[in-house]
Amino acid sequence: MDIAKRLIDYGFHAPTVSFPVPGTMMIEPTESENLDEINRFCDAMILIRKEIDENPDLLKNAPHTMKMIATENWEYSYSRQKAAFPTSYVLNNKFWPSVRRVDDAYGDRNLVCTCEPIESYQWDFHNLEYK
C-alpha cells in the first residue's frame, strides 16, 4: 500500500494493491504507455526502493496533499520538497491528490451512502424542470 501511495507523489496513478494475490501490486503497463513513460515508472520504483531504506516515513505518509505541504507547521523528518516533488519531472507535471489516505478495510466493512435521497432525483414532468 505504501509504495502505491508514494507513486502518486511521483505523478502516477496508484496501481491495484492486493489483487489477485495479497501483499502484491498488480502493475499493468498498457500498449498506450510509451517507452519514456515506462522508463519513468521504473526510475520511480528504484527511487522509492531507496527511500524505504533512507526514510520510510516518506512512504508511510504518502501521498502528500497540497494542504499538507502548505501547512505552516511541518513536523516530518524530511523536506517538503522531497515529499511533494521527488523528481524534476513532477515539478512541471504535479498532480495534487485531494486526500491523504483512506482506511480501505474500514470503508469496505462500513459502507456509507453520501447520495441525495432518491426523491431529489425526480423530475416534475408537468413543469418540465428538475427538482
Where do the model's predicted regions map?
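Non-catalytic terminal extensions of PLP-dependent enzymes
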Residues: M1-K131
